[in-house]
Every structure is written in structure tokens, then in C-alpha cells.
Amino acid sequence: LNVNSIMNGILPTVKIMKEQGYGCIINTSSMVSLCGQRSGIGYPTSKSAVNGLTWSLARELGPFNIRVNAVAPGITNTDMVASLPKEMIEPLKAAIPLRRVGEPEDIANAFLFLASDMASYVTGEILSVDGAMRT
């Protein structure tokens, strides 16, 4: 699902980006694509495939001035995380060196950076936004 939906979204737009001579693609990966997780192999495996797709497309599309990157969010304050019992949240926070979960704005800012001219020479990167949890 993760890779197929990304491919279905990217392929039609690549033609337009090539014609205009530039473009920027930012995929959504996950922290677990870089470090794995204990339970369930499907999600980290599919997100690892997103990373591979990102790296390959960066190499393939770079000559057309199309940058391809991904953001790998860590635990983020979403409705799903907010619904977890407090006794589950506190150990998660303790495992994050910044001692907090990320906010949606933290993730959005990573996307904004990669989409901006400040990242004009950044391609093929998986940007972790996880408070250093995976280190």
C-alpha cells in the first residue's frame, strides 16, 4: 500500500516536472523504517521500501532537476497517540532524548524545509524528525 500509492501519485506528475525542468517530491516514511520495531513487520518493511524508492528516484530524476526526499516522523502527538493510556505515553517520552513526543508542526516544518529553496541541493535524504529516539 505505501509504495503502490506513492508510485501511483508520483508517476503522472514526473512527466510534468520533467517538462517544466524542475520539481520536488517529498515522501512520507517513518522512524521505524530506519530502526525496525518489535511487533509487526509489515509497516516498517513497507516504509523501508518507501526509503528505497526515494533513494532510487533521487538518482533517476536528479538529472532533470527533480529532488526526491522523505520525512521519517517519530512518535507524534496525533489523535491516535493522544488516545493511548498515560502509562504508555510516559515510557515513550522517556525513550526520546528530547523527552517529548513530536507535534504535528514539527513534522510539517520538515516538509516545508525540504520543499523550500533552502533545500535546493538536498535530494535522496530521509529526514528523521523523531527527537533522536532512534539513536
Question: What does each of the following model-derived ranges do?
Answer:
Residues 34, 72-83:
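Short, flexible catalytic-loop segment of classical short-chain dehydrogenase/reductase
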Residues 10, 46:
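Active-site helix of classical SDR
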Residues 15, 55, 59-63, 120:
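Alpha-helical segment proximal to the catalytic Tyr-Lys
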Residues 30:
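Residue(s) in the substrate-gating loop at a strand-loop-helix junction
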